[in-house]
């Protein structure tokens, strides 16, 4: 879980656009961010297993 101070700091619009970093919308994690879904890989995996992300299914072959 990300620090609350970092999440609050990130929610404000930065003075310069380059300073903005992507964070997971669920847990606030800055690493392993998936831009298409707006969340980190861990939250993506949990929601995909539960079937809460439309169009995403577990691969089997």
From Swiss-Prot:
Entry keywords, A to Z: Metal-binding, Ribonucleoprotein, Ribosomal protein, RNA-binding, rRNA-binding, Zinc
Highest taxon of the lineage: Bacteria
Which InterPro entries does the entry link to? Answer: Ribosomal_uS14, Ribosomal_uS14_bact, Ribosomal_uS14_CS, Ribosomal_uS14_sf
- Look up the record and name the cofactor or cofactors this protein needs: Zn(2+)
**Residue span of the signal peptide, if any?**
none
Residues annotated to bind Zn(2+)? 24, 27, 40, 43
Q: How is the cofactor bound?
A: Binds 1 zinc ion per subunit.
Biological process (GO) annotations held by this record are: translation
Q: Which GO terms describe its cellular component?
A: cytoplasm; small ribosomal subunit
Database matches in SUPFAM superfamilies: Glucocorticoid receptor-like (DNA-binding domain)
Q: Does the keyword Lyase apply?
A: no
Write out the GO MF terms.
rRNA binding; structural constituent of ribosome; zinc ion binding
Whom does it interact with, and what assembly results?
A: Part of the 30S ribosomal subunit. Contacts proteins S3 and S10.
Q: Which family does it belong to?
A: Belongs to the universal ribosomal protein uS14 family. Zinc-binding uS14 subfamily.
Per the entry, what this protein does is: Binds 16S rRNA, required for the assembly of 30S particles and may also be responsible for determining the conformation of the 16S rRNA at the A site.
What is the protein name stated in its UniProt record? Answer: Small ribosomal subunit protein uS14
Q: Which gene encodes it?
A: rpsZ
């Amino acid at each position: 879980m990300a620090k609350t101070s970092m999440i609050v700091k990130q929610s404000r619009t930065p003075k310069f656009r380059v300073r903005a970093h992507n964070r997971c919308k669920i847990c606030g994690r800055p690493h392993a961010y998936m831009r298409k879904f707006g969340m980190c890989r861990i939250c993506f995996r949990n929601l995909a297993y539960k079937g809460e992300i439309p169009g995403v299914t577990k691969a089997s072959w």
